[in-house]
Amino acid sequence: MSFQSMASIAEAAREVAAASDLNTLEQIRLRWLGRKGVLTEAMQQLGQLSPETRREAGQLLNERKSEIQSLLQERKAELEAAAIHARLQQERLDVTLPGRREACGSAHPIRQTLEWIEHYFFGLGFETSDGPEIEDDYHNFAALNIPEDHPARAMHDTFYLDATRLLRTQTSTVQIRFLESHQPPLRMIATGRVYRRDSDITHTPMFHQVEGLLLDERASFADLRGLLSDFLHGFFAKPDLPVRFRPSYFPFTEPSAEIDIGCVICGGSGCRVCKQTGWLEVLGCGMVHPAVLAGAGVDGERFSGFAFGMGVERLTMLRYGVNDLRLFFENDLRFLKQFS
């Protein structure tokens, strides 16, 4: 093609205008501006011209290149707009359809269980209390009638920070601090994190506990039994749920008991969860030991009381049928959304 014929871009303009889609337009661009395009080959021939003609021809070719690029851009914009319009025509929105709700967060299952427990005991006149998670030896052990040679003090159970400070192993520490600042009669519960050196499918180094304490002039084990039986019936929404109290030992209560419920998984017939016994341990409780009352300055002749403690994760696992405690702490949204 001669340089004079390149002075006219009518042919390129016709091709661009006739392009009906983006693929065709791209082929036209390559034909005129590609590595082997008409304008590219013409520019490669500039070296064959005389210096006077070369300057004029080069200027002309650059002008034509700019004009063709402009035509291509305009046509591309037109074709893209037409494609969007056609797609919108095919994908008409039905404004009568319900909209999509925004993703919302929800309370963690452990938090839901804690709130249920707190609400239940608030309705019975209990107040809530809290205490430090970094405790001293006195409040975590000595004040709870746990002697120095008790197994609970062993390093395999407790996280010690130094010789006198540790991460609390139970929320019973709050019971002692509450007694130091309150006089009976009283009712309190304490919820919070506790720490023990253990980790498997049913234990984690950190877990949540609820501690309860009631002191009054005529508090009895019968009151304790009625309170916790009603609590378990309500928590599992099973008024006929079997509940039994087994004699046990805790240094800070006497007498002491552990509470079992009929297995909520198999209905008491025996399964892997209840180890074929038909029963599941869920609570520890007992009458407050006289030594604990005396250490807190409470008149044990006038006042008696009971205490109880429960692991929140275990109750939550049984309530929702979760078989691995660690799922509560892995923050997998697929798991957590089931409780929203």
UniProtKB/Swiss-Prot annotation:
Subcellular location as annotated: Cytoplasm
InterPro entries to which the protein is assigned, alphabetical: aa-tRNA-synth_II, aa-tRNA-synth_II/BPL/LPL, Phe-tRNA-synth_IIc_asu, Phe-tRNA_ligase_II_N, Phe_tRNA_ligase_alpha1_bac, Phenylalanyl-tRNA_Synthase, tRNA-bd_arm
GO biological process terms, semicolon-separated: phenylalanyl-tRNA aminoacylation
GO molecular function: ATP binding; magnesium ion binding; phenylalanine-tRNA ligase activity; tRNA binding
Main location, first listed in the record: cytoplasm
Keyword Membrane applies: no
Matching Gene3D superfamilies: Bira Bifunctional Protein, Domain 2
Superkingdom, natural source: Bacteria
Matches recorded under Pfam families: Phe_tRNA-synt_N, tRNA-synt_2d
GO cellular component: cytoplasm
Cofactor comment text: Binds 2 magnesium ions per tetramer.
Ligand binding (Mg(2+)): 254
Group of enzyme by EC: ligase
This enzyme's EC code(s): 6.1.1.20
Catalysis: reaction(s): tRNA(Phe) + L-phenylalanine + ATP = L-phenylalanyl-tRNA(Phe) + AMP + diphosphate + H(+)
Cofactor(s), by name: Mg(2+)
Keywords: Aminoacyl-tRNA synthetase, ATP-binding, Cytoplasm, Ligase, Magnesium, Metal-binding, Nucleotide-binding, Protein biosynthesis
Family to which this protein belongs: Belongs to the class-II aminoacyl-tRNA synthetase family. Phe-tRNA synthetase alpha subunit type 1 subfamily.
NCBIfam families named among the record's database cross-references: pheS
Subunit comment: Tetramer of two alpha and two beta subunits.
Protein name: Phenylalanine--tRNA ligase alpha subunit
Native source species: Acidithiobacillus ferrooxidans (strain ATCC 23270 / DSM 14882 / CIP 104768 / NCIMB 8455)
